[in-house]
From Swiss-Prot:
Keywords: ATP-binding, Isoprene biosynthesis, Kinase, Nucleotide-binding, Transferase
Native source organism of the sequence: Rhizobium meliloti (strain 1021) (Ensifer meliloti)
Protein name as it appears in the record: 4-diphosphocytidyl-2-C-methyl-D-erythritol kinase
Annotated gene: ispE
PANTHER family for the chain: 4-DIPHOSPHOCYTIDYL-2-C-METHYL-D-ERYTHRITOL KINASE, CHLOROPLASTIC
Known role: Catalyzes the phosphorylation of the position 2 hydroxy group of 4-diphosphocytidyl-2C-methyl-D-erythritol.
């Protein structure tokens, strides 16, 4: 939950943007799911979910990208799927889960590689447990989250972590420092299944974490040797990703990489003022793009 909630709602829960600082594809299961090793953190920016008890279920949407979400149809929205899944789980335990008005403030682009839908689902699960005064064991909650998508369990965590398996094997990384970052998306949706199907190599070198890195500079050096194995096929599918990456480099980013399956790219900067100046420069040159200077979660000092 966060201060400065959505007006008219009893509770507001943040759904922060997920950033894959590195994403290595290391294999593929017999069922077709790819095995990943990913260094993940979360930004201060993101969507928000408002909740209040109601006489009937309602779902409303606002925010810059509300229209894009509505165009997809409410039936497939992860917020509603999370509500229905948790309600069934609680009903099976003989517990009440009354009608609720859910409101999604959609501030992140759709299909952008920064986990917007997964974060929305995770925030909905956390928010409904609070609104309904219910508890679910951590293992059961993670199981529910995984039914909604491979990224949802890590979005429940919201702290720096390493994700393995299909994304559900989570190891917290409390010593990862925060980073000043600029997120840029050219507002071109990228299909995750298409990018995975386009992978030429399904088995790539594993993610190697530094043993003694503590400072931001040490982590930047270590991350420079990491990869996003989805970036080459994503660039081939959507050449605009290269344009975005070049814009971040030209603006002075110390490290530039694509997040998830794209098309969002991030640039890491040495200080928030530098990040904000870069965001202003990129926005001036590309006023229709999504450009956001922000800071990530992490251990300061």
């Amino acid at each position: 939950m966060q201060a400065g909630g959505i007006p008219g709602f009893a509770l507001t829960f943040a759904a922060p943007a997920k950033i894959n600082l590195a994403l290595h594809v290391v294999g593929q299961r017999a069922d077709g799911h790819h095995l990943l090793e990913s260094l993940v953190t979360f930004a201060e920016c993101g969507d928000r979910v408002g909740l209040i008890a109601a006489d009937r279920d309602r779902f409303t949407v606002s925010g810059r990208f509300a229209t894009d979400l509505s165009a997809e149809g409410n039936g497939g929205n992860l917020v509603l799927r999370a509500r229905d899944l948790l309600r069934r789980e609680l009903a099976a335990q003989g517990r009440m889960a009354g009608p609720v008005h859910l409101h999604l403030e959609k501030n992140l682009p759709i299909a952008s590689g920064i986990g917007g839908g997964s974060a929305d689902a995770a925030a909905t699960l956390r928010g409904l447990l609070s609104l309904w005064g219910a508890t679910v064991e951590a293992a059961s909650l993670n199981s529910l989250a995984l039914q909604l998508g491979a990224d949802v369990p890590m979005c429940l965590d919201r702290g720096p972590l390493v994700a393995r398996g299909i994304g559900e094997e989570i190891t917290p990384l409390p010593d990862l420092p925060p980073f000043d970052v600029v997120l840029v998306n050219p507002l071109v949706a990228v299909s995750t299944p298409v990018i995975f199907r386009s992978l030429v190599r399904k088995t790539n070198p594993p993610l190697v974490l530094p043993e003694d890195a503590r400072s931001t500079a040490e982590w930047l050096t270590a991350m420079a040797a990491m990869r996003n194995d989805l970036e080459p096929p994503a660039r081939a599918h959507e050449p605009m990703i290269e344009t975005v990456s070049n814009a971040l480099r030209d603006a002075g980013a110390a490290l530039v990489r694509m997040s998830g399956s794209g098309a969002t790219c991030f640039g890491l900067f040495t200080g928030m003022k530098s990040a904000e100046r870069a965001a202003e420069t990129i926005s001036a040159g590309h006023p229709r793009w999504y450009v956001q200077a922000t800071r990530t979660a992490g251990k300061s000092g």
